[in-house]
Amino acid sequence: MSMSIYDKIFPPKLLTLPNGKQVSKPRSRAPLAAVILVAMTILSVEVTGFDMGVLVSRIKEFFVILGDMIPPQWDYMPQIWQPLFDTIKMSLLGSFIGSILVVPFAMLASTNIIHSRVVVAAMRLLLSIIRTLPTLVSALIATYIFGLGTLAGTTAIAIFTFAYIGKILYEEIETVDMGPFEAMEAMGATKVRSFISAIVPQVLPSYLSNCLFCFEGNVRYASILGYVGAGGLGLILNEKIGWREYASVGMILLALFVTVFIIETISRAARKRLV
């Protein structure tokens, strides 16, 4: 058996068993991993220009800004309602559109449903390409196409949901019991009809649970899409940070925190019933 360079430098330890037979125990790779990690960290610091001294000396500014946010400006709340509702609407509609549109694509990306390697590879490549596109970039592109406003934000969230749910869904489809599906096909049912009747009931609980989980995250993502003009809380958040009105920023963040907490609580309870 050929030995690696590491094993040649650090020979395996010989152990004697009770029956007298000797076996070799390879040396741990932990020291090598630690050296590589330290080297990569040093290289990253050099490339990025990270300065721990600046971080330590300026960390107090964070607490200064945090102090300016407390207490929040309560009388600014009436101006928050509409952008907050826009954020929720973008998240809900984008999540719904993306999760519905991706179902046929997830079906085409499943190897146990579609036996054409070309089709499966093409669908998975499409989902991978879309998944690598940052939501902010999608929103920025959408603003050039649809203009400023919530339509661009909704489109960006739908694109993200499409890619996120698509990968999870086709992986879930590939783990189902294929017996009912094959039986329906044997009786003459079409592939689509067999999929709807035999596969969908098996993946529906986890599919709905993942959609709810994705919606939770989309509410948070939607709140920053306003930085590229896609509507929602991000618009006024960017404005107030720019004007250094930190008390208003504190009120916006508090409203967002409460909203996300309520949505997550409801979603968590719903997902427990589904799974």
Predicted regions and their residues:
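Transmembrane alpha-helices
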Residues: 191-225, 247-255, 259
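N-terminal, non-cleaved signal-anchor transmembrane helix
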Residues: 1-96, 103, 108
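Cytoplasmic-entry segments and transmembrane alpha-helices of multi-pass inner-membrane transporters
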Residues: 105-139, 168-171
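Membrane-cytosol interface at the C-terminal ends of specific transmembrane alpha-helices
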Residues: 148-199, 205-214, 265
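Alpha-helical membrane-interface segments at transmembrane helix boundaries
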Residues: 81-89, 123-130, 212, 216, ...
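Hydrophobic alpha-helical transmembrane segments of polytopic membrane proteins
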Residues: 233-270
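Hydrophobic positions within alpha-helical transmembrane segments of bacterial inner-membrane proteins
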Residues: 95-103, 107, 111, 136, ...
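Generic hydrophobic transmembrane alpha-helix motif, especially the helices
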Residues: 127-161
